[in-house]
UniProtKB/Swiss-Prot annotation:
Organism, as annotated: Homo sapiens (Human)
Compositional bias (Gly residues): 217-229
Lineage per the UniProt record: Eukaryota, Metazoa, Chordata, Craniata, Vertebrata
Keywords in alphabetical order: Cytoplasm, Metal-binding, Nucleus, Phosphoprotein, Zinc
Record's keyword annotation contains Zinc: yes
Name recorded for this polypeptide: MOB kinase activator 2
GO CC annotation: cytoplasm; cytosol; nucleolus; nucleoplasm; nucleus; perinuclear region of cytoplasm
Length: 237
């Protein structure tokens, strides 16, 4: 995944984009942007003689670093004032602390919670072992699914709230390429609930068609962390 990041060429004006109902990221001239035409469907398949958990660990760690890097390019525009909630379309995400308590937070706070918690996990030898002979915990796959769900939220927020800045920085090709690779990998190993990703099905359909046959999932309330259902047309997760 060395293809991910290049230097930015321009500085956006820092203003929060107009309501993204127009979904600029779906416009053909933007969805065509890629930094490689590699067939990621082939890249995500588990290689022969490679342990499944090793493959999941390696790719999950890499996706974490690259999504963190992608977010860092627009982080100065994602503030407590511009993004008072962690929102994507009509869905508002809440963080759940170690005691399972729901925490309402701004988007930058949510992303910080995500990146800090994932960083702690991927550097924990008991969870992501790197030394020969160390075994993965029995709960490893469920932990990977949790990580992927949170990383998906970050990617979705970048598209929904900060695509204008990403476009101004000429990094939308990087974002699209990262999204395709991440989604195809997650679908290959059933790491994301279709209900969780349904909010971005329109983008997934456009970007991944012909790249691995990604199927759209139905919509649903209370997916992911077990948040309550829709209220006033705003879903909480």
């Amino acid at each position: 995944m060395d293809w991910l990041m290049g230097k930015s060429k321009a500085k956006p004006n820092g203003k929060k984009p107009a309501a993204e109902e127009r979904k600029a990221y779906l416009e053909p001239e933007h969805t065509k942007a890629r930094i490689t035409d590699f067939q990621f469907k082939e890249l995500v398949v588990l290689p022969r003689e490679i342990d499944l958990n090793e493959w999941l660990a390696s790719n999950t760690t890499t996706f974490f670093h690259h999504i963190n890097l992608q977010y860092s390019t627009i982080s100065e525009f994602c503030t407590g004032e511009t993004c008072q909630t962690m929102a994507v379309c009509n869905t508002q995400y809440y963080w759940y602390d170690e005691r399972g308590k729901k925490v309402k937070c701004t988007a930058p706070q949510y992303v910080d919670f995500v990146m800090s918690s994932v960083q702690k996990l991927v550097t924990d030898e008991d969870v992501f072992p790197t030394k020969y002979g160390r075994e993965f915990p029995s709960s490893f796959e469920s932990l990977v699914r949790k990580i992927c769900r949170h990383l998906f939220h970050v990617l979705a927020h970048i598209y929904w709230a900060h695509f204008k800045e990403t476009l101004a920085l000429e990094l939308h090709g990087h974002l699209n390429t990262l999204y395709v690779h991440f989604i195809l990998f997650a679908r290959e190993f059933n790491l994301l609930d279709p209900k969780e990703t349904a909010i971005m099905d329109d983008l997934t359909e456009v970007l991944c068609s012909g790249a691995g046959g990604v199927h759209s999932g139905g919509s649903g309330d209370g997916a992911g962390s077990g948040g309550p259902g829709a209220q006033n047309h705003v879903k909480e997760r």
